[in-house]
């Protein structure tokens, strides 16, 4: 009985899909074995794993393959074979097996099982397999004539082998196992060949006799030739076996039979199958296939053949692998990164991203808010424009309503006196608006000269052909006398009139240049410095008699008092309307620091003063000086209260020495600049007034420059009787005022009250935040600088203020004398700058004046003394006293100049000599390294150079920061050769004295 194992290939099942309908093909080998070529019937068993058992084979080392040998190469000791002979009849397989070739289908069923048989198409059989089948048939036929020789004379069968089988393989196997043969040497067992086809390993059990080897079926000898002759395609595997098996005489233990199969998948390689005959080999074999003869009933002659078909090796697959090289950070020299730090960094990144998103949202919200604010601002601006337009409309309506209610206007003139000839009147605008109900007829001097003195403004165009004498303001007041004097209906307009109070003036003789008429017929006084020569007279020369047309005692003053009260009522009514109509504006005006609030208070105070003055003059005793200096009133147009106050504040600027220049300490051109003396007066005492004064300078026109310097001083002392102002003005800087008149210059009650309030809190003056104290200090500062720090300031008024303040406290007197404005200038600075040495003397006599006080530019009163003009011996004596009490070597913070340098630069030889006498350092240098001598050389003043070189301490070799000396500066100009000679002589004299 035989057992056959077959292993199917995956590709074989694809090629053979249709089972054969005829009996399978089988091949009988020369050794008597019947090979079944139909392997498909074992596929099911092979797939289930029930029939295959792997046999461990101990293989030797691989031998060299000789792939270049020819396919018909024979084993050694095998001679040429004769043509094919009939196969031996002594070989008969125990179980006949038939091999089916692809295209030939037979109905004979295999003896073992009914497995389906696969057929292959003709196109799928390779040419190489046909050649192998033909070669196997040819070798079997050629081996038949030599069967007898091989059977009895040779112990080695002739085997078919693949082209890669080495020729020395059988010799080596025979030499290794020589003791296994019992008679003649048996053919050695060949090692398995490593091929690429299928390998059939057959293990033959030992036989007790050789009779089984000689019995064979004639079917095997004729089967293969029939297949070749019929042209059938070769099967999938070809079993190459010899047609003889050597039959030695004595019994042998085993025989080796080599069977080589070639797989259909690889046409170029072959595997070898080793068939071993062993007498009782314990080598396990695959489980036998079902057979009609049990294994235990097998005779010795029966040989079991195990055939297993090894599938071809899988195709070579190319694996692509990514090879990574692991390198540690330590080997690269890098710092090891802590995984915790990485996680923390990730957390930080996420936190930052969240914060960024939050900030982005906030930014978007801010942008939205900004857009909303911009829209709100635009809406507010639009609202403000609408309100301004509404205010303008309301003002226009208010003026129109007042114009409709107005039936007439009256120009009021107060305390006028008859004059002989033309008068040049200069006035101070008090800014009082008068709206009088009634009718007046405008009459000129030629019409009713003896009855009234009014000059009606709108009728001025009708009087252009009158004489100059007829255009003079008349001194008599005319009152309404009935409805017959009402003006025509064409003259209905609302005009504001001003009470322009003239403090002093000069008289002009008759002539066309005595006065000028305004566009509306008003008379304007010309500047007191501009009238022609020979026409100027003092007011004391005016006659003191009354006008013939004016009664000695008239009710004019009482009537004016009534009008003043009416003006007060109208102002109060106007304020009430402002509060009700525009409460926000009214609240802003009511602030203590508001300029409008100050103007309102001053206006009311002026009205009170006017009322009290005219009430006191109702029945006064006649005094020629008082009557001569009583302020006549002129009429001037105004458009608003603010413009009136501008005229009031700056109306004095054209008076006095209009062309004389003095200092304003603003740090320009060495710390000072030359401006009009009036610009440095008391209006600069507070920062609030400074901003207004700067704006008012732009509004200053030619109509505002007609008032004298003393007018505003008289206004500052609101409680001073008006008759004394002119007397103070007429007195010169060095003149003494009679004691009886000086007593009449008293500070205002507001000033005295502020002094009392401030004297109780002197330590808190510099740091106080109390609004009342600050207001008191502001009041004192304004009035003090108006009285003491102007070009027109009167020593008598200053003495009166100092006398009134001294009883309060000596400390308060020191505070008042050294009070500084926002530029750091004191009354002493201003008095020296204006050359008011009488006031300087008064300030020095107090004993509390700080002479070395520096302003913001770093200048003291001593430093600016060389710039003043001391015209008299008394003035020069004050200068010497000032220089002795102060430090003459103080340098300014701006530029480092000294008093001596300022005197030299302004060519003040007398002041330079006084400074040198008061121990002034002649060698001090400014920030540029220049000395007083260098400045004198630069200006080319030979006398000053000679005076400086005469000083024993003078050093002519000093150099400035540019490396220049006084001599090099003098040599730059060809006109300074005399100075260069003086410098050379001084240098030679110094060298000679040094030797």
From Swiss-Prot:
Residues 1-29, 68-127, 443-467, 503-558, 617-642, 663-705, 721-740 are annotated as: Disordered. PROSITE patterns: ANK_REP_REGION, ANK_REPEAT. Residues 680-693 have a biased composition (Acidic residues). Strongly expressed in colon, liver, lung, skeletal muscle and kidney. Residues 511-523 have a biased composition (Gly residues). The keyword Transport does not apply. Residues 625-640 have a biased composition (Low complexity). ANK repeats lie at residues 823-853, 862-890, 895-924, 928-958, 962-992. Residues 343-404 form a coiled coil. Keywords: ANK repeat, Coiled coil, Cytoplasm, Repeat. Pfam families: Ank_2, KN_motif. It is found in: Cytoplasm. Residues 101-124 have a biased composition (Polar residues). SMART domains: ANK. InterPro entries: Ankyrin_rpt, Ankyrin_rpt-contain_sf, KANK1-4, KN_motif. PANTHER family: KN MOTIF AND ANKYRIN REPEAT DOMAIN-CONTAINING (PTHR24168), KN MOTIF AND ANKYRIN REPEAT DOMAIN-CONTAINING PROTEIN 4 (PTHR24168:SF24). May be involved in the control of cytoskeleton formation by regulating actin polymerization. This is KN motif and ankyrin repeat domain-containing protein 4. The lineage of its organism: Eukaryota, Metazoa, Chordata, Craniata, Vertebrata.
């Amino acid at each position: 009985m035989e057992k056959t194992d077959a292993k199917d290939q995956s590709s074989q099942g694809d090629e053979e899909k249709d089972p054969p309908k005829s009996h399978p093909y089988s091949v009988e080998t020369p050794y008597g074995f019947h090979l079944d070529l139909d392997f498909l019937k074992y596929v099911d068993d092979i797939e289930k794993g029930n029939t295959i058992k792997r046999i461990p084979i101990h293989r030797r080392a691989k031998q060299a393959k000789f792939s270049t040998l020819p396919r018909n190469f024979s084993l050694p000791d095998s001679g040429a074979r004769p043509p094919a002979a009939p196969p031996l009849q002594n070989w008969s397989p125990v179980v006949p097996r038939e091999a089916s070739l692809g295209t030939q289908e037979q109905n004979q069923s295999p003896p073992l099982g009914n497995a389906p048989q696969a057929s292959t198409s003709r196109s799928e059989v390779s040419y190489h397999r046909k050649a192998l089948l033909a070669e196997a048939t040819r070798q079997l036929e050629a081996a038949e004539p030599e069967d007898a020789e091989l059977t009895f004379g040779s112990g080695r069968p002739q085997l078919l082998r693949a082209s890669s089988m080495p020729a020395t393989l059988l010799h080596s196997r025979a030499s290794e196992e020589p003791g296994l043969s019992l008679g003649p040497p048996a053919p050695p067992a060949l090692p398995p060949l490593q091929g690429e086809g299928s390998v059939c390993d057959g293990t033959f059990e030992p036989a007790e006799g050789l009779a089984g080897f000689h019995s064979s079926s004639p079917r095997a000898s004729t089967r293969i030739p029939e297949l070749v002759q019929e042209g059938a395609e070769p099967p999938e595997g070809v079993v190459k076996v010899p047609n003889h098996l050597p039959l030695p005489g004595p019994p042998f233990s085993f025989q080796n039979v080599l069977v080589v199969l070639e797989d259909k998948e690889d046409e170029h390689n072959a595997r070898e199958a080793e068939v071993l005959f062993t007498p009782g080999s314990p080598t396990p074999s695959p489980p036998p296939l079902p057979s009609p003869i049990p294994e235990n009933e097998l005779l010795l002659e029966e040989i079991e053949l195990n055939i297993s078909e090894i599938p071809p090796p899988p195709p070579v697959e190319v694996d692509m692998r990514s090879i990574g090289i692991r390198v540690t950070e330590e080997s690269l020299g890098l710092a090891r990164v802590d995984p915790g730090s990485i996680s923390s960094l990730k957390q930080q990144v996420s936190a930052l991203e969240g914060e960024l998103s939050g900030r982005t949202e906030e930014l978007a919200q801010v942008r939205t808010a900004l857009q909303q604010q911009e829209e709100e601002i635009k809406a507010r601006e639009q609202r403000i424009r609408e309100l301004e337009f509404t205010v303008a409309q309301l003002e226009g309506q208010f003026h129109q309503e007042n114009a409709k209610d107005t039936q007439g206007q009256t120009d009021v003139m107060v305390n006028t006196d008859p004059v002989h000839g033309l008068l040049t009147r200069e006035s101070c605008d008090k800014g009082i608006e008068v709206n009088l109900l009634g009718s007046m007829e405008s009459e000129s001097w030629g019409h009713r000269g003896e009855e009234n003195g009014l000059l009606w403004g709108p009728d001025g165009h009708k009087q252009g052909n009158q004489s100059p004498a007829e255009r003079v303001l008349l001194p008599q007041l005319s009152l309404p006398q009935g409805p017959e004097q009402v003006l025509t209906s064409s003259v209905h307009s609302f005009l504001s009139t001003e009470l322009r109070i003239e403090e002093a003036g000069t008289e002009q003789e008759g002539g066309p240049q005595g006065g000028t008429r305004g566009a509306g017929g008003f008379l304007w006084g010309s500047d007191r410095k501009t009238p022609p020569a020979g026409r100027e007279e003092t007011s004391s020369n005016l006659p003191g008699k009354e006008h013939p047309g004016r009664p000695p005692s008239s009710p004019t003053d009482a009537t004016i008092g009534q009008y003043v009260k009416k003006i007060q009522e109208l102002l109060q009514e106007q304020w009430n309307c402002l509060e009700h109509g525009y409460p926000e504006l009214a609240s802003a005006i009511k602030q203590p620091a508001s300029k409008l609030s100050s103007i309102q208070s001053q206006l009311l105070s002026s009205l009170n003063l006017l009322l009290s003055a005219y009430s006191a003059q109702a029945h006064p005793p006649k005094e020629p000086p008082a009557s001569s200096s009583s302020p006549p009133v002129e009429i001037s147009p105004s458009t608003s209260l603010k413009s009136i106050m501008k005229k009031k504040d700056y109306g004095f600027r054209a008076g006095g020495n209009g062309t004389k220049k003095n200092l304003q300490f603003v740090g320009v051109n060495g710390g000072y600049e030359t401006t009009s003396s009036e610009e440095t007066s008391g209006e600069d005492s507070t920062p609030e007034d400074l901003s207004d004064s700067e704006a008012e300078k732009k509004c200053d026109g030619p109509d505002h420059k007609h008032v004298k310097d003393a007018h505003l001083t008289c206004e500052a002392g609101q409680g001073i009787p008006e008759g004394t102002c002119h007397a103070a003005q007429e007195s010169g800087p060095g003149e003494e005022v009679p004691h009886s008149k000086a007593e009449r210059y008293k500070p205002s009650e507001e000033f005295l009250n502020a002094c009392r309030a401030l004297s109780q809190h002197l330590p808190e003056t510099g740091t106080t935040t109390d609004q009342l104290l600050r207001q008191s200090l502001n009041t004192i500062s304004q009035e003090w600088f108006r009285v003491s720090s102007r070009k027109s300031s009167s020593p008598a008024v200053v003495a009166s203020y100092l006398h009134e303040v001294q009883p309060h406290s000596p400390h308060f007197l020191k505070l008042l004398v050294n009070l500084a404005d926002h530029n750091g200038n004191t009354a002493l600075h201003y008095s020296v700058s204006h050359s008011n040495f009488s006031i300087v003397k008064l300030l020095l006599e107090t004993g509390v004046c700080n002479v070395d006080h520096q302003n913001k530019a770093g200048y003291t009163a001593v430093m600016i003394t060389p710039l003043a003009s001391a015209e008299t011996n008394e003035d020069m004596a004050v200068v010497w006293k000032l220089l002795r009490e102060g430090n003459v070597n103080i340098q300014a913070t701006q530029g480092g100049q000294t008093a001596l340098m300022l005197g030299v630069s302004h060519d003040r030889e007398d002041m330079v000599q006084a400074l040198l006498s008061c121990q002034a350092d002649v060698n001090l240098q400014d920030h540029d390294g220049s000395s007083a001598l260098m400045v004198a050389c630069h200006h080319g003043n030979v006398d000053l150079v000679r005076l400086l070189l005469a000083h024993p301490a003078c050093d002519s070799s000093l150099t400035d920061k540019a490396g220049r000396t006084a001599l090099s500066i003098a040599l730059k100009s060809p006109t300074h050769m005399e100075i260069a000679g003086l410098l050379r002589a001084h240098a030679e004299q110094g060298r000679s004295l040094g030797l």
